[in-house]
């Protein structure tokens, strides 16, 4: 009886353990007891559902102690697994011995009642023990594995790009500065500014906003690569969709144009969603019942739809001709807002859709300029219920065009010398995209706030835990 059985194994292979003695270890979720017998729901973290343990005063020598245990106390239970086909739970464990591993204080905040997500954010160190967050973070784990599996199975090389960087991939300047200088008395340059040449790295350094530029270096050596790591944006955006620290998946593919880029993005999205649905049916059922009642239908729709395609110019025309009054008026040259994206995917196409060929003035410098000189070979993948979930492009491989674009945006070539040099040594057509991992988890779970799909959220004014 030394071997502890995981609760997940009991649920997945119930018949194998039926009428046999098993040992489980976990935490008490609920406990109710009379003078003669009691019931404990135990969760060991391996599975979404709890196990019901029945304990009898005639069999359990420490019955009185067990019957008064507070919620969240940790215990080990030895007993016989008995199938209960006529009950809500498929089986129960009839206890023969219960060992107290660790007591919980009676002021444990997660008692058996409904708690708001706002309250649970204040106890982020404990919220993984709640049903909603147990489900969320298990889905997050499985989705992360599915992403790696999708790319590894197709021969992509997993590449670690730096978190500390001296360049701004997006050219937006919304970056967190990293320094070891004394901010009370920083060294001053001849021009009167801070002298970053005396800093740790000898230059101004920041937390990365994207690994894409570094990833392109590896794509032009390994052909197909992907990154999956943390990124940081110093955007003062206190919204349900923005966080200062989040995770990004960024594949880059050599010898691939925008059409290839969209094909990989569509296949990846479908694969990951289906993988999570197959591996986490209990969690998805929970979200569908308690968080987003249309979730299952929407996920199945995405998995089984052929994604639509429309150019930005066509999309603007469709929106203008729809007769719908938008909060933000639609005109050519604006960046599409969430309301526009959702209308396209929910009302016009009624399925996921790629919007391509955006105006160059609202997109990044590295995107390939189209023949019209006004648009770039960019794509955004829009999905029902959320809008944009993926953004990507064919990269500008022509050195002269790339330099001209950087000059337009007043970007310093010296900061990107190594990126420009890629265009000198065997450049080729190449493409890639970025997927915000938290936004994907929000979509798969139906959770409405990015703060609730990342373990310890970092947002404007918040860096607790």
UniProtKB/Swiss-Prot annotation:
An example of a Gene Ontology cellular component annotation for this protein is: cytoplasm
Query: Keyword RNA-binding on this protein?
Result: no
User: Principal localization?
Assistant: cytoplasm
Pfam families per record: tRNA-synt_2, tRNA_anti-codon
| Keyword field | Aminoacyl-tRNA synthetase, ATP-binding, Cytoplasm, Ligase, Nucleotide-binding, Protein biosynthesis
Lineage, top-rank taxon, reads Bacteria
Q: Which GO terms describe its biological process?
A: asparaginyl-tRNA aminoacylation
| Segment forming the signal sequence | none
**SUPFAM superfamilies tied to this protein:** Class II aaRS and biotin synthetases, Nucleic acid-binding proteins
Q: Where in the cell is it found?
A: Cytoplasm
MF (Gene Ontology): asparagine-tRNA ligase activity; ATP binding; catalytic activity, acting on a protein; nucleic acid binding; transferase activity
Is Metal-binding tagged as a keyword?
no
Q: What EC number(s) has UniProt assigned to this enzyme? A: 6.1.1.22
State the similarity comment: Belongs to the class-II aminoacyl-tRNA synthetase family.
> How does this polypeptide assemble, per the annotation?
Homodimer.
Question: Can you say what this protein is called?
Answer: Asparagine--tRNA ligase
Q: What organism does the UniProt record list as the source?
A: Clostridium perfringens (strain SM101 / Type A)
């Amino acid at each position: 009886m030394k071997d502890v059985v995981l609760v997940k194994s009991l649920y997945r292979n119930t018949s194998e353990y039926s009428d046999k003695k098993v040992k489980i270890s976990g935490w008490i979720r609920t406990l109710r007891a009379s003078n003669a017998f009691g019931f404990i729901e135990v969760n060991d973290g391996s599975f979404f559902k709890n196990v019901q343990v029945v304990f009898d005063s005639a069999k359990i020598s420490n019955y009185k102690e067990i019957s008064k245990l507070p919620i969240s106390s940790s215990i080990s239970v030895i007993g016989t697994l008995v199938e209960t086909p006529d009950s809500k739970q498929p089986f129960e464990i009839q206890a023969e011995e219960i060992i107290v591993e660790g007591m919980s204080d009676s002021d444990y905040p997660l008692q058996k009642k409904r708690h708001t997500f706002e309250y649970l954010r204040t106890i982020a160190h404990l919220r993984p023990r709640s049903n909603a967050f147990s489900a969320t973070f298990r889905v997050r784990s499985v989705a992360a594995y599915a992403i790696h599996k999708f790319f590894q199975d197709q021969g992509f090389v997993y590449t670690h790009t730096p978190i500390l960087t001296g360049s701004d991939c997006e050219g937006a300047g919304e970056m967190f500065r990293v320094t070891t200088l004394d901010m009370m008395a920083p060294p001053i340059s001849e021009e009167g500014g801070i002298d970053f040449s005396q800093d740790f790295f000898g230059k101004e350094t920041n937390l990365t906003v994207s690994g894409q530029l570094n990833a392109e270096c590896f794509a032009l050596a390994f052909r197909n690569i992907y990154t999956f790591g943390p990124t940081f944006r110093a955007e003062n955006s206190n919204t349900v969709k923005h966080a200062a620290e989040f995770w990004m998946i960024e594949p880059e593919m050599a010898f691939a144009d925008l059409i290839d880029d969209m094909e990989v993005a569509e296949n990846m999205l479908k694969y990951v969603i289906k993988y999570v649905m197959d591996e986490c049916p209990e969690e998805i059922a929970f979200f569908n019942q308690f968080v987003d009642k249309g979730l299952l239908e929407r996920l199945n729709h995405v998995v089984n739809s052929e994604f639509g395609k429309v150019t930005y110019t066509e999309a603007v025309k469709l929106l203008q001709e729809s007769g719908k009054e938008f909060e933000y008026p639609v005109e050519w040259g604006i960046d599409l807002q969430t309301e526009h994206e959702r209308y396209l995917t929910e009302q016009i196409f009624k399925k996921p859709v790629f919007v391509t060929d955006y105006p160059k003035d609202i997109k990044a410098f590295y995107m390939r300029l189209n023949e019209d000189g006004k648009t770039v070979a960019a794509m955004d993948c829009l999905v029902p219920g959320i809008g944009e979930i993926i953004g990507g492009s064919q990269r500008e491989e022509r050195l002269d065009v790339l330099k001209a674009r950087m000059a337009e945006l007043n970007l310093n070539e010296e900061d990107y010398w190594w990126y420009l040099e890629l265009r000198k040594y065997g450049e080729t057509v190449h493409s890639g995209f970025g997927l915000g991992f938290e936004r994907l988890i929000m979509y798969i779970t139906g959770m409405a706030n990015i703060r609730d799909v990342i373990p310890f959220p970092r947002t404007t004014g918040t860096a607790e835990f």
